A protein has these predicted regions:
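Electrostatic cytochrome c docking/interface patches
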Residues: 21-38, 121-149, 223-249
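Cleavable N-terminal signal peptides
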Residues: 14-16, 25-26
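Conserved N-terminal glycine/acidic-rich loop preference
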Residues: 123-133, 158-177
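Extracytoplasmic electron-transfer domains, predominantly the class I c-type cytochrome c fold
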Residues: 44, 49-113, 165-166, 172-220, ...
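Short pre-active-site segment immediately N-terminal to redox-active cysteine/selenocysteine motifs
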Residues: 38-44, 49, 109, 149-155, ...
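Bacterial N-terminal signal peptides that target proteins for export
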Residues: 2-14
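His/Cys-centered metal/cofactor-coordination and adjacent catalytic loops
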Residues: 60, 120-132, 217-242, 256, ...
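Sequence context surrounding c-type heme c attachment/ligation sites in exported
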Residues: 27-43, 56, 72, 141-154, ...
C-alpha cells in the first residue's frame, strides 16, 4: 500500500514539476501550443483518446470527451485552482484515500486548454440540444431529487440539501453539478454510464427517460442558487389556449370520473375512494396556475392527492393541458 501511495503522489509531483518548469512559450492560446502543454502535463494522468475503461485501470478521469462534458467557465476555474476537489476519497480510492492536489495553470493556459478540448475532444454520441436546461421546472427538479434518492445515486455522490452536504463520497461530488456539466453530455451519460466508465461501480438505474430528465433537472440546480426555473403555464401553448378544445378533452378524459357537469358523478366514481373532486364546487379562477398545471400534468399522487387522478401530460400534451385549464377556468366558478 505504501508503494502504491508513493506511486500516486510521485506521479502528481512529476506533473506539477513539469508544469512549473515548462518554457513560457508553451503557454499560448493557439492550438499547437495548447496541444504541447496538454501532452507534457495532462496525458501523464488523463487519457485523451481510446475506448472507455474501468477506473481501476486509469490514473485519473478520462478527458476523451472533455469538450462535450464540461461547462467552459467551470473548466477554467478548475484548471486555475479555484474549484474544490471532485473526488474527496480520491479517484483511485483503492490505492490511496484522500483528494489529490491538481496542478494549476494560468488563466491564459486554461483558456488554451479549453479551446483545444472544444475542438478536438467532442463526443459524437452526445446530441446537442438533447436536454434543454431552460425547460426545467421547480416541480421537475423536486421530483428529480426524490428519484435521485430512490435510484440510490445518493450512495456514491454528494449533493447539497438544506445547506448541508449529504451522500457518499466514493465518486464525483455533485453539489456543484449545475456549474460543471454540459447537460447534453450528462443526459447521454445517464442513459448508460457503462458506456463511459465500465466496471467502475457506476450504477445503471432502472429509470424511465422522464425520471432521468427529472434527475438532471435536480442536478442542474445544484450549485446554482439563482437557478431560473421554467414556468410552463407561461409557454406559447397557454397563450392560445381554447376552452372549446378543452371541453372536448374534458369529455374524452375527465368526464369519466368528474362527470359531465363536474359534479364528481362520472361512471368510474361510484366505487372510488377517495371520491373524485367536484369541479362544480370549485372556483377555478382562484386556483393558482402552477397548482392546476401540476395537478393535471403530473397527477394526483405527485401533488399529495389521490393516485386515481392520472398524470395526463403525456396523453394530452402541453396544448391539451392548456386547453383543459382554460375550460375549467371558463366553466366552473364555484357554488352559486
Amino acid at each position: 500500500m505504501n508503494l502504491r501511495r508513493r506511486m500516486i503522489v510521485g506521479g502528481s509531483l512529476v506533473v506539477l514539476v513539469g508544469l512549473m518548469s515548462m518554457p513560457k512559450l508553451l503557454f499560448g492560446s493557439d492550438q499547437p501550443r495548447a496541444k504541447e502543454l496538454i501532452q507534457q502535463a495532462c496525458v501523464s494522468c488523463h487519457r485523451l483518446e481510446g475506448a472507455a475503461d474501468s477506473r481501476f485501470n486509469l490514473r485519473a478521469p478520462d478527458l476523451i470527451w472533455a469538450g462535450s462534458k464540461y461547462q467552459r467557465p467551470w473548466l477554467i476555474r478548475w484548471l486555475t485552482g479555484k474549484e474544490a476537489p471532485l473526488y474527496v476519497k480520491g479517484y483511485r480510492w483503492d490505492l490511496s484515500e484522500g483528494p489529490m492536489k491538481h496542478p494549476v495553470v494560468t488563466e491564459a493556459d486554461a483558456n488554451a486548454i479549453a479551446d483545444y478540448f472544444e475542438k478536438n475532444n467532442k463526443d459524437p454520441r452526445v446530441q446537442v440540444g438533447a436536454y434543454d436546461v431552460t425547460k426545467v421546472t421547480k416541480f421537475e427538479a423536486a421530483f428529480g431529487g426524490m428519484a435521485y434518492k430512490a435510484h440510490a445515486c445518493l450512495g456514491c455522490h454528494t449533493v447539497e440539501e438544506n445547506g448541508k452536504l449529504i451522500g457518499g463520497q466514493q465518486s464525483a461530488a455533485l453539489e456543484r453539478a449545475g456549474q460543471r456539466y454540459n447537460m447534453d453530455w450528462l443526459f447521454r451519460f445517464g442513459l448508460n454510464p457503462q458506456d463511459f466508465v465500465p466496471h467502475s461501480g457506476e450504477f445503471l438505474a432502472d429509470a424511465t427517460e422522464p425520471q432521468l430528465r427529472a434527475v438532471l433537472g435536480y442536478l442542474a440546480a445544484q450549485g446554482v442558487p439563482d437557478f431560473k426555473y421554467y414556468e410552463p403555464w407561461t409557454a406559447p401553448e397557454f397563450g392560445k389556449a381554447s376552452p372549446g378544445r378543452g371541453k372536448v378533452i374534458y369529455k374524452e378524459y375527465c368526464m369519466q370520473c368528474h362527470g359531465a357537469t363536474g359534479k364528481g358523478d362520472g361512471p368510474a366514481a361510484a366505487n372510488l375512494e377517495p371520491k373524485p373532486a367536484i369541479h362544480a364546487n370549485i372556483n377555478f379562477g382562484d386556483v393558482p396556475n402552477e397548482y392546476l398545471y401540476n395537478m393535471i400534468n403530473h397527477g394526483g399522487a405527485a401533488m399529495g392527492k389521490s393516485a386515481n387522478m392520472p398524470y395526463w401530460g403525456l396523453t394530452i400534451g402541453q396544448q391539451g393541458v392548456a386547453d383543459v385549464m382554460a375550460y375549467l377556468k371558463a366553466t366552473f366558478k364555484g357554488p352559486k
